Amino acid sequence: MDTVTLDSIDLKILRALQEDAEIPIAELAEQVGLSQTPCWRRVKRLSEAGVITKRVAIVDPQALGLRLTAFIAVRTNQHNERWLERFARGVAAMPNVLEFHRMSGETDYLLRVVARDMEHFDSIYKQLIEIADLNDVSSHFSMEQIKDTTVLPVEDAAGLKPRRGVR
């Protein structure tokens, strides 16, 4: 994997693509002050280096009837690799789990889940507790989503340490 040094133009490209991944290359090039070919090459280089990992459509969960968002805090007495592999495999197979984090502090794992309603959530919850031996599972329901973004603060990139071939 090639090493990439991010400069101010790369950061402008990343900012623009995070806002609209379908932006035409001509428009992107104009926004960042490049001609089309050098802009396209930079986007390609950022993709090949793993800085841009994928381009996706962001779908409104409400439009799909997924009106309930819950955060599930999991505690376990099991902290061995075999247990984690089993638990991670089971959670990864659950399409309603959008995020899955190993945590520090009192909670061992935190999951963000979407569901149609409480009955649907309960079926997801029951599926989760069957995966592995869990000590404590508590659910917290979102009353209102105040901020939702996938846009990373590229302005902070100068403070990042090298990752995946990027410095």
Language-model-derived ranges and their functions:
Residues 1-167:
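A compositional/biophysical signature of low hydrophobicity enriched in polar/charged and small residues
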